[in-house]
Amino acid sequence: MLHVISPAKTLDFETPPITRHFTQPQFLDHAQQLIDELRPLNPQQVSELMDISEKLGVLNAQRFLDWQLPFTTENAKQAVLAFKGDVYTGMQADRFSSQDLAWAQQRLRILSGLYGLLRPLDLIQPYRLEMGTHFANSRGKNLYEFWGNRLTEQLNRELAQAPQPLLVNLASNEYWGAVQARHLSGEVITPTFKDRKNGQYKIISFFAKKARGMMSAWIIQQRLDQAEGLKDFNSAGYRYNPAMSSAREWVFTREEPV
């Protein structure tokens, strides 16, 4: 059983990593191609492309220029420890044991606009390139066309080696769109997290993102390899809600945010 999550815009390259172990991204040559096509953009063009401030445009244009191979622990950091958004706040990977990290390396994948598909210990350098960015490139009009079926094929190769050919989708719609789900050679289950507000269960973005990270950590720390085990997830007050769930969308609800 594999599970996938989204990356984060917020990064932490200052805190020392909790492990010396690392691997290299599997799609590094494709990332290099994207970098080569992004480097000619000036800060204003980067700001307009990503709909970000002038200050962030300057920062990210410089990141494209600074990006260089080879990746080492001196100029890069393990992906699961470098990302620091809401999902990763929920995950708290900096508290993982060495055994947790080793297990996650085999079961967790992070979708990325620049790196394609990352394992937790794959080294990355600082970047910002969301999957939904409308960046016309040598392969098409956006990043979905750039990646094509490559990420799906890699996931299929890994699903073929898993004890159960099941993919748990904990990614956002933006990133899941880079996976051609109908061509996956395994079952897909998408957990959804809803909080009770004004008498109704609703998806509240901040809480849902954090919950996806908590479920990822729970899968890893429980060494979960069977779908049914997901229904026992109960972090932060969430519970599996069979009445609201379907065969492929498993809904977890809670009465009050914790």
From Swiss-Prot:
InterPro entries xrefs: YaaA (IPR005583)
Gene Ontology terms: biological process: response to hydroperoxide
Any Gene Ontology CC annotation: cytosol
One Pfam family matching this protein: H2O2_YaaD
Leader peptide range in chain numbering: none
Family statement: Belongs to the UPF0246 family.
HAMAP family: UPF0246 (MF_00652)
Full protein name: UPF0246 protein CJA_0191
